[in-house]
């Protein structure tokens, strides 16, 4: 299976500089590969009526709870929060560990390959030694992550959102690309001057949304 067209899309994409250097690649996957993922029952299964039914379906299909920012690692804690009315939402993330579809498995192997890794690094002129992790994840209802930069140990993030729910476009669950409001830009300046300081999450009201990625 040839996935090299993905490399060409990365190489040919223009680097957008605002609010920070990034790529915005429309139709990143071919129609064939997108349809394959959208129709795969291991990934997109029928709607369930209870949290426990969702959990059972996920576990039986090779998904495991994944530690992730803004999320709990306890299914019982997630159920407790999602069934009540907490002051703040709490989410939970699952990662797929066993791929039933051979083509999807090959796609993930490709997106963890040296060739894919090298193409991303060359695009953004990254010369340090790095590793790559590509995976399929699900963020369940309640997931929300406050504005944040990447942790210092991470030099690049890529995100491919795939959802076959036609209502998703009407929901505010897009990725926001942000910049600090003027009165908070001193924080960014401090981070830039102090590379040994880990950066933190900040409140939404400190930032302006420059762009939404759907």
List PLM regions with ranges.
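Fe(II)/2-oxoglutarate
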Residues: 1-18, 185, 189
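Short, functional N-terminal and low-complexity linear motifs
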Residues: 1-7, 83-89, 124-127
